[in-house]
Regions:
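Internal intein/HINT superfamily modules and their associated LAGLIDADG
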Residues: 1-261
Length: 261
């Protein structure tokens, strides 16, 4: 948790015209956290109850963080029981993307600020893990078996959050089950062979429902897409790739997403 003065100093750098990437690199604070501070400066108050299972359910305090976390969960997350009514949420983040690991942990803390978040090293990845009794209320898509073997549908309150923060939801899905690649070809122009590059985004998930949530949100955002095979969604038109670059990537440091993350 960063104090208010730290947040103000970071936002002062942004107001100078600095990019999120450069400020993140200088301060060591994730782009996700800095972006969240531009929308809400004050730290979220700590609370021991759950906004969803309270006697009168209320709105989440950081819906943008929730939209991002929901995308990560639907891509590479799971909710499992532990003991005495406690559950843990685990999201797999590749070692190659430490910024993604930071952003995932920040989002998890923002959604459940009163619970601890841990990083558990596994071969090739870090399992960002949060313990809480309330993950089943916050992520009602959890259930036995694999996500693509069961129905995945958003509750009305979740859909409202996704509709209000669509880019955060798309970022979470792409960061968990997507990639940005660059195709290239050569052409002879004026007797000279020239190389032309064509960046595109892919999102791959076995669940028809999760792919539909992704494409429905892209439709809302005006991003053109097409399905290239049974599990794969492609975004390749130049204007749509530019939109994705502006909101999803470049991601961390000076690197674009170039491998599955």
């Amino acid at each position: 948790m960063y104090d208010l003065e730290t947040r103000k100093r970071v936002l002062a750098l942004i107001r100078q015209g600095r990019s999120l990437n450069s400020v993140s690199k200088q301060t060591g604070i994730s782009r996700y956290a800095i972006r969240a501070w531009t929308m809400r400066l004050e730290p979220i108050r700590r609370t021991t109850d759950c906004p969803r299972c309270a006697p009168e359910p209320r709105a989440l305090e950081d819906p943008a963080a929730y939209a991002y976390l929901l995308g990560l969960y639907l891509g590479d997350g799971c909710v499992s029981p532990l003991r005495k009514g406690l559950y843990f949420l685990r999201i797999a983040c590749a070692d190659a993307w430490p910024g993604l690991i930071d952003s995932c942990a920040e989002a998890m803390r923002a959604v459940r600020p009163d619970n601890s978040v841990y990083r558990v090293q596994r071969q090739g990845c870090v399992m960002v893990t949060g313990y809480s009794k309330h993950w089943p209320c916050l992520l009602p898509q959890h259930g036995p078996g694999k996500k693509h073997d069961r129905v995945i549908a958003l509750e009305p309150w979740q859909q409202e959050i996704v509709s209000t923060h669509p880019w955060e939801f798309v970022r979470g899905l792409v960061h968990s089950d997507g990639c940005r690649i660059t195709n290239w070809t050569t052409k002879i122009v004026a007797g000279e062979r020239r190389r032309y590059e064509y960046p595109r985004y892919f999102f791959t998930n076995k669940s028809d429902d999760i792919r539909r949530l992704f494409t429905d949100t892209l439709d809302q955002l005006g991003v053109a897409w097409r399905q290239t095979n049974a599990w794969n969604i492609s975004v390749a038109r130049r204007a749509s790739v530019a939109l994705m670059d502006a909101h999803v990537g470049p991601v961390y440091g000076n690197n674009l997403i170039r491998r599955w993350v």
